Amino acid sequence: MTTITPDEMKSLETLFMSETGTPSILLMEHAAQGVAAAISRHAPKSARVLFLCGPGSNGGDGYAAARLWCLGGGQADVWEVTSAVRGDALTNRTLALLYGVRVLPSVDAVDVAEYAAVVDALYGTGLNHAIEGDAAILIHRLNDHPQIPVIAVDIPSGLDGTTGRALGADVVRAAETVTFHRIKQGLLLRQGVEYTGEITVQPILIRPGDDIDLGFGGLEMLSPAALAPLFARTPALHKGDCGRAVIFCGSRGMVGAAAFCANACIRAGAGLTTLLCRESLLPMLQVLAPGATCVPLPETNGLLTPQAARITRETLDKADAACIGCGCGLTPDVTMLLRVFAEADCPIVWDADALTLLATHDGILPLKEEDIITPHPGEAARLLEQHVEFILDEPLDALSRLHDLCGCCVLLKGARTLVSDGDATYISLYGTPALAKGGSGDVLSGILTALLCQRNRLSTSLSTSALAACGVLIHALAGLRAEKRFGANCSTPQALIDTIRLDDKEL
């Protein structure tokens, strides 16, 4: 499944209606059916529901949905921006009144608390300015009643459908957004994450492949159902078939980062996991990550010796994939190993402290095409020498710049994590605040390393970005399982590891 922009959707609808002779009001009817179905998920069939209808086709969807709600046994009140609507919206307004929909005379007549649910059909994806006047007053009033579910039609009013940016101070906060044909890109970016609630895609007659034929790309989204067949194991499989992973993570005070990464790597299917560790950390890591073999790196006065570089190089020569960075520290001896990892033949996952060092040391970038960097917004800002606000405000631009700088697959962490190799771009539909805790990123790096080292077993045709997107999905689903068991506040990195699955079961 891929996203679509509002401009692309408009072109697609126009072409579809022209080629098939389908009237636009028929598309509107299918859209309204999806909205009416969504209302029934939040309110009883006989409930009284408020419909906020704007002057355009979004309002027309609202009038049609109000009629369908009345036909199903419910009660519908409409507040409208204006009664002077045209075209399909006028037709559906007329029909709505015939079927018992009541139009409220003014904004003062609207008491949001009287309704079981509210439908936001004020403004759609064509909006390009802040909402003002009575509509803004109503949106503010709606958002003051969070206990009343709001169903947004195609997109919450006040949100940019392409960028996800809030167009003003007043944006509808929806419990569910019913979007049509494909998810609009803006629902998944910036403030879109905050305002859209659950996203439901309603078909409106246009065939799923029609936009692909037009060359519309969009952000790609993976379904949990795609994981199980990809990671299925044959009965004769042995550990050598599942790859050898090498991890250099952890330092004094950050031993847990190495353990989380290694244990997640083992859990996610790596056949053999080896921890390169400072010799002073060896006793602790052998207890914290008993499933991993440990290769001690010699130290003098707390710093790795030049011999550590030789041992690291020899160990990486046997690896199918490797990871560096989680809690490894920022000391000069780590920079020495950074260069050894950059010269390795196997794909590398670069995370945390390794990214900070990449940002401050010349001569290492660009990396190999099959490598993966995993910055959060702060690390991305350091790499690009930008403010964090730029990363948050322009995530797709930041993603592109990071790829140009590093020459490899980029995994930009966030509420909607993005992955790109310069061609395909993936976005995660799944996530939970349970992941907002130190150590979650270490678990993700372990998962990614495990997938990379199993690449030959899985599919040599699978791109690095697709593999990384699978890792993000596995990590997110583990977060949802951990949240289900322990709650968003009480989940831990270890709980994530314990709930890692390479399929979509037990959600």
Where are these regions (language model features)?
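Short beta-alpha junction loops
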Residues: 82-85, 156-157, 280, 354
